[in-house]
Every structure is written in structure tokens, then in C-alpha cells.
Amino acid sequence: NLARLGIKPRTISKELVFCLDWLPVRGRIKEIEFNGVYVDFLKNDEFFGRKYIYSTPQGDFADNDLRFGFLSLGALEIAKALDFKPDIIHCHDWQTALLPICIKWRKHLKDDPFFKDSRVVFTIHNISYQGQYDRNVLDKFGLPEFLFTSQGLEFYGKANLLKGGIFVYPATAKEP
């Protein structure tokens, strides 16, 4: 809780609107400055105003693909809204694996000159959590069907987002 730390985020007067599953979703940019470092957050209470982050004691949220797709694509939208061209985008685990997948393959992102010089670093903290969904997740995020192969995102009949985050940049798979 930022308030307990005495940090008051400022809401930047930018509302982001972009498509998930072919429907518009909205988010607000919140920014904090702490010891000279600015951190931007994406706010959407429908996706993240919940008691639990990933799941309840009964299991995963049914919309986790959309929630973390919103986070991944929203990070790119924040960069564009603030005209911040990142040199490096550091993604962590399956929850942000859609970001490198979408930069490489999503129709309106793959040719976007805004990110042409950006590079992605992908860190895996816990390989047990892989973000596996039905193959229709490709359509939800405007990704081509040809990605659903054993050399791509397919893993035992499901789309595996963690695998996709690794496979997009083959050099990651070669690291020791």
C-alpha cells in the first residue's frame, strides 16, 4: 500500500484505450516518483481491483489471460502515451509473456516503428506457472494462427504463454 509508505501517486491525465479480445478496454496511468525514480502503473479495477492477484483459494481467475494481456499490452501503450521509447523491456514470467509475443507477431505492433529499436529481456522466476490457455487466446490478442505449432506456442494442445515468451527470442533458449 503506497499510502502507508507516504507515497501519493499522481494520476496522469491520460486514459488508455486499446483492444483485447476485439473489445475496447480502458486503463489509467498512475505515476509515482520515489528518490528521483519515476514508476508508471496501469490502473484498471475490473481486472486488478480484487482481493487476490493471480487466483483465489478455489483456483485461477477465469479471465487471467485477459488480465495479464491487459498488463502486457498496457505497458506498451503507456510507453507510447508518454512518448518513452524503451531501449530494454524486461518481462517476468508468463504474466508478461504476451508482450514479446505481441511485439513480434501482433498485427498492429509487429510493424510499429515506435518499438523497432527496443529489445526484450525475459526472466523466468518460476517455471511451474506457465500460463496455458485454449488456442483461442491467439485470436483474443490478434495473433496469427500459425503460432499454434509445437515449434511455437502449442504445448500438449494448449497455448503456452511462457513457452511463447521464450520462443519469440531464440537467444534466450540458448543461455546457460
Question: At which residue positions do the language-model features occur?
Answer:
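Catalytic cores of nucleotide-sugar-dependent glycosyltransferases that transfer UDP/GDP/TDP-activated
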Residues: 1-176
